């Protein structure tokens, strides 16, 4: 695996947890097993190459979206802090299959945002935030960025193969 297209970023290491080498991960994946099931994962620094690391244990923090993980060979706080800021990766071939109407959120990044199926683009999806509801960050053609809840009432149509999604925002949402 050589290119970025061969990898999925499933989370970011955001902080050391305790003194035994555990780390907190901010997930960008809706599949908790990526953080809880032992096995091989990969870490990547901003401009570095992915390198393998063994996930030993993982758990979700109660009431939070963060996970706490333990990697092989990371046995103290200093070793954990050295990894903060890196991305956690899995091979793109590890994508779980989805039911009709479900999407891998990362596939939405780059899509045109439209108000009508046959209409012009009003912007592009540039990022996503996982919170209580997933939020799409859309950069409007005017240059402003807005956060749009990824719920069916506001994003009723997604055409991955055609490269766009349709928005039906409530009044004022795109003006915030």
From Swiss-Prot:
UniProt GO BP: ribosomal small subunit biogenesis; rRNA processing
GO cellular component: cytoplasm; ribosome
Gene3D superfamilies documented for this protein: PRC-barrel domain, RimM
Chief location: cytoplasm
UniProt GO MF annotations: ribosome binding
Keyword Chaperone applies: yes
PRC barrel domain span: 100-173
Keywords in alphabetical order: Chaperone, Cytoplasm, Ribosome biogenesis, rRNA processing
InterPro entries registered for this protein in UniProt: PRC_barrel-like_sf (IPR011033), PRC_RimM (IPR056792), RimM (IPR011961), RimM_N (IPR002676), RimM_N_sf (IPR036976), Transl_B-barrel_sf (IPR009000)
Key word rRNA processing present: yes
Compartments reported by the entry: Cytoplasm
SUPFAM superfamilies reported for this sequence: PRC-barrel domain, Translation proteins
Domain notes: The PRC barrel domain binds ribosomal protein uS19.
Subunit structure and binding partners: Binds ribosomal protein uS19.
Record's function text: An accessory protein needed during the final step in the assembly of 30S ribosomal subunit, possibly for assembly of the head region. Essential for efficient processing of 16S rRNA. May be needed both before and after RbfA during the maturation of 16S rRNA. It has affinity for free ribosomal 30S subunits but not for 70S ribosomes.
Family to which the UniProt record says this protein belongs: Belongs to the RimM family.
The protein's name: Ribosome maturation factor RimM
Organism: Prochlorococcus marinus (strain MIT 9303)
